[in-house]
């Protein structure tokens, strides 16, 4: 097995990066454009991940390439086109802004840390960003998934991508991995502020629906903690908002395929609520830290249409955390705790570096 070539190294010189400690904020991914060809590439990568679809590979390959990649890209492209912005995909836009703001907030706290973002599927890839961080001199990297709740289908897949990259590298940086932050007080407070802000502007509905991304039910039975962590997030958020159990519902969206997923499903729940005479509903998606296709199109458009068609009168979608200062401050505080013990504040000792370089050259180092 051959390993990737190492970046050039000179004794006694600091790395190109401002600090050897870095954070890689990892999100799910997005196509490069709202077109069928771009969606075909994206879906092929996404749906080929065994963490996402746990079906024997030969059988799934036939289904994926024989049916799904022939039919789904065009339909998905239309959905993406409905939410695409001049800046590009909302998910990518928000993730990029969060990374930039996180670096700034950490800097304001005295932490000199490089922060980049990457996508598990699509661009910029996790491997490409790790390559760049390594080339810039990062020797300690915190892997920070944009998923508050752990799932083997998302968080573990990010870790897989990091492990895969490391398997091809000779000199591996030191890594730390964040599993979850579903019950982090700062995250819960940021969610509560988002909801309260919406209520101040538009009033408060009698029911708050908390919609999380769904996963196959069998993953729960096989030991995935995602379902439990979603419910804990919902409970803590409800408590922060002062809502009793009869004032909120937890639902799961984005079901794919015919297998049973975590229930209750979001859209059927909203339809039943409208049919039961509930005229207004507020919907928030706590598991998504940035607005994306699943929130802007599936909830704010499709679910809204279903609720109103079933007899509802008012549907309010509460936007994700996005670039909320309260959220970024909470993320910075959480990240700082995860970085504890790593040097992020000490100034670089240039004199020590110079002497180290002189010793290395005296012992025969080429540079």
From Swiss-Prot:
PROSITE patterns: FERROCHELATASE
InterPro entries: Ferrochelatase, Ferrochelatase_AS, Ferrochelatase_C, Ferrochelatase_N
Binding site for Fe cation: 213, 294
Keyword Cytoplasm: yes
Organism domain of life: Bacteria
EC number(s) given by UniProt: 4.98.1.1
Protein name: Ferrochelatase
